[in-house]
Amino acid sequence: MVNTRAEAEAMVRSCRYFPLGNRSNAGVRGEWGEFKNYRDYMDAVNNELVIVPMIETNQALGNLDAIAICPGVLLIGPSDLSIELGVPLDYQCDIYQRALDKIAATAAKHGIAAGMYFIPPAMDPNFFVQKGFKFFTMPWGPWAKAGIENGLSGIKR
Protein backbone atom coordinates (compact mmCIF):
# COMPACT_ATOMS: atom_id res chain seq x y z
CA MET A 1 0.00 0.00 0.00
CA VAL A 2 1.22 3.48 -0.84
CA ASN A 3 -0.21 6.86 0.11
CA THR A 4 2.21 9.34 -1.48
CA ARG A 5 4.49 9.74 -4.45
CA ALA A 6 7.50 9.42 -2.13
CA GLU A 7 6.23 6.05 -0.89
CA ALA A 8 5.59 4.89 -4.47
CA GLU A 9 9.08 5.98 -5.53
CA ALA A 10 10.63 4.19 -2.54
CA MET A 11 8.67 1.06 -3.46
CA VAL A 12 9.96 1.16 -7.04
CA ARG A 13 13.55 1.76 -5.91
CA SER A 14 13.45 -1.16 -3.49
CA CYS A 15 12.23 -3.50 -6.26
CA ARG A 16 14.80 -2.61 -8.92
CA TYR A 17 18.54 -3.22 -9.13
CA PHE A 18 21.17 -0.50 -9.61
CA PRO A 19 21.18 1.84 -11.50
CA LEU A 20 17.36 2.04 -11.37
CA GLY A 21 17.04 1.18 -7.70
CA ASN A 22 18.69 -0.12 -4.58
CA ARG A 23 17.44 -3.70 -4.38
CA SER A 24 19.77 -6.14 -2.65
CA ASN A 25 21.13 -8.90 -4.86
CA ALA A 26 20.54 -11.52 -2.13
CA GLY A 27 23.41 -13.71 -3.22
CA VAL A 28 23.82 -15.31 -6.60
CA ARG A 29 20.31 -15.22 -8.12
CA GLY A 30 21.69 -14.29 -11.54
CA GLU A 31 23.31 -17.69 -11.80
CA TRP A 32 19.95 -19.41 -11.51
CA GLY A 33 18.36 -20.28 -14.83
CA GLU A 34 19.49 -18.88 -18.15
CA PHE A 35 21.66 -15.97 -17.01
CA LYS A 36 25.42 -16.42 -16.96
CA ASN A 37 26.17 -12.70 -16.72
CA TYR A 38 24.84 -11.12 -13.53
CA ARG A 39 24.33 -7.72 -15.18
CA ASP A 40 22.08 -9.38 -17.80
CA TYR A 41 20.03 -10.89 -14.98
CA MET A 42 19.67 -7.55 -13.18
CA ASP A 43 18.73 -5.77 -16.42
CA ALA A 44 16.11 -8.43 -17.17
CA VAL A 45 14.60 -8.02 -13.69
CA ASN A 46 14.58 -4.23 -14.04
CA ASN A 47 12.87 -4.46 -17.44
CA GLU A 48 10.37 -7.25 -16.73
CA LEU A 49 9.32 -6.67 -13.14
CA VAL A 50 5.71 -5.60 -12.56
CA ILE A 51 5.42 -3.28 -9.58
CA VAL A 52 1.94 -2.97 -8.12
CA PRO A 53 1.29 -0.22 -5.54
CA MET A 54 -2.03 -0.74 -3.76
CA ILE A 55 -4.46 2.15 -3.44
CA GLU A 56 -6.46 1.70 -0.23
CA THR A 57 -6.77 5.06 1.53
CA ASN A 58 -8.27 8.53 1.20
CA GLN A 59 -4.72 9.91 1.32
CA ALA A 60 -3.76 7.78 -1.69
CA LEU A 61 -6.88 8.92 -3.57
CA GLY A 62 -5.85 12.52 -2.93
CA ASN A 63 -2.35 11.82 -4.26
CA LEU A 64 -3.38 9.60 -7.15
CA ASP A 65 -1.88 11.68 -9.97
CA ALA A 66 1.46 11.94 -8.15
CA ILE A 67 1.50 8.20 -7.40
CA ALA A 68 0.58 7.33 -11.00
CA ILE A 69 3.65 9.18 -12.32
CA CYS A 70 5.82 6.42 -10.83
CA PRO A 71 6.34 3.36 -13.03
CA GLY A 72 4.00 0.49 -12.25
CA VAL A 73 0.30 -0.13 -12.11
CA LEU A 74 -2.44 0.82 -9.66
CA LEU A 75 -4.06 -1.98 -7.70
CA ILE A 76 -7.12 -1.47 -5.53
CA GLY A 77 -7.63 -3.30 -2.27
CA PRO A 78 -11.45 -3.28 -2.47
CA SER A 79 -12.25 -4.11 1.16
CA ASP A 80 -9.68 -1.80 2.71
CA LEU A 81 -10.63 1.03 0.36
CA SER A 82 -14.33 0.65 1.21
CA ILE A 83 -13.53 0.71 4.94
CA GLU A 84 -11.30 3.78 4.54
CA LEU A 85 -14.10 5.54 2.62
CA GLY A 86 -16.51 4.89 5.50
CA VAL A 87 -18.64 2.42 3.54
CA PRO A 88 -17.36 -0.97 4.77
CA LEU A 89 -17.82 -3.64 2.10
CA ASP A 90 -20.57 -1.60 0.36
CA TYR A 91 -19.15 -2.00 -3.13
CA GLN A 92 -22.30 -0.67 -4.83
CA CYS A 93 -22.55 2.72 -3.08
CA ASP A 94 -21.85 6.00 -4.90
CA ILE A 95 -18.87 6.95 -2.71
CA TYR A 96 -17.09 3.71 -3.56
CA GLN A 97 -18.05 3.89 -7.24
CA ARG A 98 -16.69 7.44 -7.55
CA ALA A 99 -13.38 6.27 -6.06
CA LEU A 100 -13.20 3.43 -8.60
CA ASP A 101 -13.96 5.85 -11.43
CA LYS A 102 -11.22 8.22 -10.25
CA ILE A 103 -8.65 5.43 -10.07
CA ALA A 104 -9.56 4.03 -13.49
CA ALA A 105 -9.51 7.51 -15.09
CA THR A 106 -6.17 8.40 -13.50
CA ALA A 107 -4.61 5.13 -14.65
CA ALA A 108 -5.88 5.69 -18.19
CA LYS A 109 -4.61 9.28 -18.19
CA HIS A 110 -1.12 8.09 -17.24
CA GLY A 111 -1.14 5.09 -19.60
CA ILE A 112 -0.92 2.50 -16.83
CA ALA A 113 -3.13 -0.43 -15.87
CA ALA A 114 -5.62 -0.35 -13.03
CA GLY A 115 -6.45 -3.60 -11.30
CA MET A 116 -8.49 -5.08 -8.48
CA TYR A 117 -6.99 -7.24 -5.75
CA PHE A 118 -10.06 -9.46 -6.01
CA ILE A 119 -13.55 -9.20 -7.41
CA PRO A 120 -15.91 -8.48 -4.51
CA PRO A 121 -18.55 -11.13 -3.82
CA ALA A 122 -21.70 -10.99 -5.94
CA MET A 123 -20.13 -8.51 -8.39
CA ASP A 124 -19.79 -9.15 -12.11
CA PRO A 125 -16.16 -8.86 -13.31
CA ASN A 126 -17.44 -7.17 -16.48
CA PHE A 127 -18.62 -4.27 -14.36
CA PHE A 128 -14.99 -3.50 -13.50
CA VAL A 129 -13.77 -4.13 -17.04
CA GLN A 130 -16.31 -1.58 -18.33
CA LYS A 131 -14.96 0.94 -15.80
CA GLY A 132 -11.47 0.44 -17.27
CA PHE A 133 -9.85 -2.10 -14.96
CA LYS A 134 -7.39 -4.30 -16.82
CA PHE A 135 -6.42 -7.09 -14.43
CA PHE A 136 -7.61 -8.93 -11.35
CA THR A 137 -5.88 -11.11 -8.83
CA MET A 138 -7.74 -14.23 -7.87
CA PRO A 139 -7.99 -16.16 -4.63
CA TRP A 140 -5.50 -18.88 -5.47
CA GLY A 141 -6.01 -21.16 -2.47
CA PRO A 142 -9.35 -22.72 -3.48
CA TRP A 143 -8.31 -22.93 -7.14
CA ALA A 144 -5.00 -24.56 -6.28
CA LYS A 145 -6.75 -27.07 -4.01
CA ALA A 146 -9.31 -27.91 -6.72
CA GLY A 147 -6.54 -28.35 -9.29
CA ILE A 148 -4.54 -30.63 -7.03
CA GLU A 149 -7.61 -32.69 -6.13
CA ASN A 150 -8.56 -32.96 -9.80
CA GLY A 151 -5.05 -34.05 -10.74
CA LEU A 152 -4.82 -36.60 -7.94
CA SER A 153 -8.31 -38.01 -8.63
CA GLY A 154 -7.04 -39.49 -11.88
CA ILE A 155 -4.38 -41.58 -10.15
CA LYS A 156 -5.32 -45.22 -9.92
CA ARG A 157 -4.55 -46.64 -6.52
Predicted regions and their residues:
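Non-membrane alpha-helical structural segments and their capping/turn regions in soluble enzymes
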Residues: 5, 61, 93-101, 145
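Alpha-helix-loop-beta-strand connector modules within alpha/beta enzyme cores
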Residues: 16-21, 43-46, 92-115
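Non-catalytic positions within long, well-ordered alpha-helices that form the structural scaffold/packing
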Residues: 68, 129-130
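C-terminal helical cap(s) of enzyme catalytic domains, especially alpha/beta-barrels
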Residues: 5-21, 129, 141-157
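Conserved anion-binding
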Residues: 1-70, 78-83
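Glycine-rich phosphate-binding active-site loops on the catalytic face of alpha/beta enzymes
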Residues: 1-7, 74-85, 133-151
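Hydrophobic faces of well-ordered beta-strands that scaffold small-molecule active sites
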Residues: 51-56, 74-76, 114-117, 135-138
